[in-house]
């Protein structure tokens, strides 16, 4: 692979992985977590890691094009994943939620773009933790 800025890419990757390590010190996914809890945790964990990898520039970055182009498709996949009842397919959804091409990682992208849409509430969202993350989305889907 060739990158225009290998040093910048390496820095983003280090920030991303460090974010995971720090998040996991405070928040852990229980072994008994339900499938829906696992998806919510992935949105929280990957969302924060992907957001933080963007760096401090994200505060002044206009992400409206990202949101317009990628948020609804990510949420649509998240909705499909949450309504899946077949256990073997659930394993596939959990895998696809965080792997593959960047914009196809629907849990990571849904979480990141949700956070970008709520930059003024990041501290509150973080302190509430994964169990309340994206409540308007998860709670609505869980009721249906």
Residue ranges and their predicted role:
Residues 22-26, 88-91:
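Active-site-adjacent bridging/hinge elements
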Residues 9-10, 52, 114:
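Short, hydrophobic/aromatic alpha-helical segments in well-folded domains
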Residues 1-14:
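Short pre-active-site segment immediately N-terminal to the catalytic Zn-binding motif
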Residues 2-3, 39-40, 105:
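Short consensus segments that form the blades of beta-propeller domains
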Residues 26-83:
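Post-HExxH zinc-binding segment in Zn-dependent metallohydrolases
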Residues 66-144:
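Pan-zinc metallopeptidase signature
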Residues 14-23, 48:
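Active-site His/Glu-centered metal-binding helix of metallohydrolases
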Residues 16, 43-47, 109-113:
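A structural signal for well-ordered alpha-helical segments within the folded catalytic domains
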């Amino acid at each position: 692979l060739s990158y225009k800025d290998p040093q910048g890419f390496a820095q983003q990757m280090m920030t991303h992985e460090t974010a995971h390590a720090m998040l996991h010190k405070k928040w852990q996914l229980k072994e008994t977590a339900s499938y829906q809890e696992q998806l919510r945790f992935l949105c929280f964990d990957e969302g924060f890691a992907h957001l933080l990898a963007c760096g401090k520039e994200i505060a002044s970055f206009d992400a409206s094009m990202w949101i317009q182009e990628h948020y609804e498709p990510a949420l649509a996949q998240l909705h499909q994943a949450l309504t899946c009842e077949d256990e073997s397919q659930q394993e596939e959804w959990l895998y696809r939620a965080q792997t593959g091409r960047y914009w196809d990682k629907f849990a990571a992208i849904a979480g990141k773009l949700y956070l970008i849409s709520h930059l003024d509430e990041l501290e509150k969202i973080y302190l509430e933790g994964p169990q309340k993350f994206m409540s308007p989305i998860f709670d609505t889907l869980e009721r249906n």
